[in-house]
């Protein structure tokens, strides 16, 4: 059975993440080459540039691994095939979101991107939740150890400081040998342009009403930049 191995080309200029100096920071001097992709819905593809992932980029040390994913298995699966635990450790079948557009994000409380992303995610959810949008937040502590708190602390932070009303789930790994199955699916379904690795906090996956991943956005893409893509899927 045919399989496809994903490359590690990453299509967007990842610039300064404004992290605390005590944590490692992404490389800011990455070479750019003209992309062969003519167009895309995503703002970073529209820039027309691509770049190779730098070995200096702060990914999970020693745990990351490349793997091939069976093409038919990807085609046959949807997000609805997975059950995850919510922030209170209760099982949640993602089939409950059938027929909705999903924006899935790995979040962190102490990242330079935290404030802008939580604020904009909350606005998007407020504006489109009654039209069929769900934002699903998965806390992750793999990038700079920027989500160290307990589930209760994470929930308190998001719901109190940013008035987050969208679902927040149990803390997960998004890379490495302990990657949550739902993230194995998300990464496998989003093609070879990004490779297997989630690059940093607040990488985003857009899932259509049929449970299929239709777009993947780098951490530096703000939620507001995704609004038009969300509206198109909601109208479909």
Curated annotation (Swiss-Prot):
Disulfide bond residue pairs: none
Which residues constitute the catalytic centre? 111
Its recorded reaction(s) are: a hydroperoxy polyunsaturated fatty acid + 2 glutathione = a hydroxy polyunsaturated fatty acid + glutathione disulfide + H2O
Q: What class of enzyme is it?
A: oxidoreductase
The record places the transit peptide at 1-64
In its UniProt record, a GO molecular function of this protein is:
phospholipid-hydroperoxide glutathione peroxidase activity
Give the GO terms filed under biological process for this record.
Answer: response to oxidative stress
Q: Which InterPro entries does this UniProt record tie to the protein?
A: Glutathione_peroxidase (IPR000889), GPX_AS (IPR029759), GPX_CS (IPR029760), Thioredoxin-like_sf (IPR036249), Thioredoxin_domain (IPR013766)
Question: Where in the cell?
Answer: Plastid, Chloroplast stroma
| SUPFAM superfamilies per UniProt | Thioredoxin-like (SSF52833)
Q: Tell me which UniProt keywords the record has, alphabetically.
A: Chloroplast, Oxidoreductase, Peroxidase, Plastid, Transit peptide
Going by the entry's taxonomy, the superkingdom of the source organism is recorded as Eukaryota
Q: Mostly located where? A: plastid
Q: Name one GO cellular component term.
A: chloroplast stroma
Under which EC number(s) is this enzyme classified? Answer: 1.11.1.12
Stored Gene3D superfamilies:
Glutaredoxin (3.40.30.10)
Purpose: Protects cells and enzymes from oxidative damage, by catalyzing the reduction of hydrogen peroxide, lipid peroxides and organic hydroperoxide, by glutathione.
Protein family per UniProt = Belongs to the glutathione peroxidase family.
> Which PANTHER family does the record associate with it?
GLUTATHIONE PEROXIDASE, GLUTATHIONE PEROXIDASE 7, CHLOROPLASTIC-RELATED
Q: What is this protein called?
A: Phospholipid hydroperoxide glutathione peroxidase, chloroplastic
What species was this sequence derived from? Pisum sativum (Garden pea)
């Amino acid at each position: 059975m045919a399989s496809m191995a994903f490359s590690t080309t990453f299509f967007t200029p990842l610039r300064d993440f404004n992290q605390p100096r005590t944590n490692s920071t992404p490389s800011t001097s990455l070479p750019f080459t003209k992309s062969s992709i003519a167009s895309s819905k995503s703002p970073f593809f529209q820039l027309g540039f691509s770049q190779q992932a730098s070995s200096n980029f702060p990914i999970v040390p020693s745990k990351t691994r490349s793997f091939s994913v069976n093409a038919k298995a990807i085609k046959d699966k949807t997000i609805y095939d997975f059950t995850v635990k919510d922030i209170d450790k209760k099982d949640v079948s993602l089939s409950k979101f059938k027929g909705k557009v999903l924006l899935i994000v790995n979040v962190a409380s102490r990242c330079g991107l935290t404030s802008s992303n939580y604020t904009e995610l909350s606005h998007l959810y407020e504006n489109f939740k009654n039209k069929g949008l769900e934002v699903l937040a998965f806390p992750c502590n793999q990038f700079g150890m920027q989500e160290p708190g307990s589930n209760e602390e994470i929930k308190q932070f998001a719901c109190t400081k940013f008035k987050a009303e969208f679902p927040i789930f149990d803390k997960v790994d998004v890379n490495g040998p302990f990657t949550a199955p739902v993230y194995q699916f998300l990464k496998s379904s989003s093609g070879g342009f990004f490779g297997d690795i989630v690059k940093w906090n607040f990488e985003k996956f857009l899932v259509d009403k049929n449970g299929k991943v239709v777009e993947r956005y780098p951490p530096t893409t703000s939620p507001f930049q995704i609004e038009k893509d969300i509206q198109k899927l909601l109208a479909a």
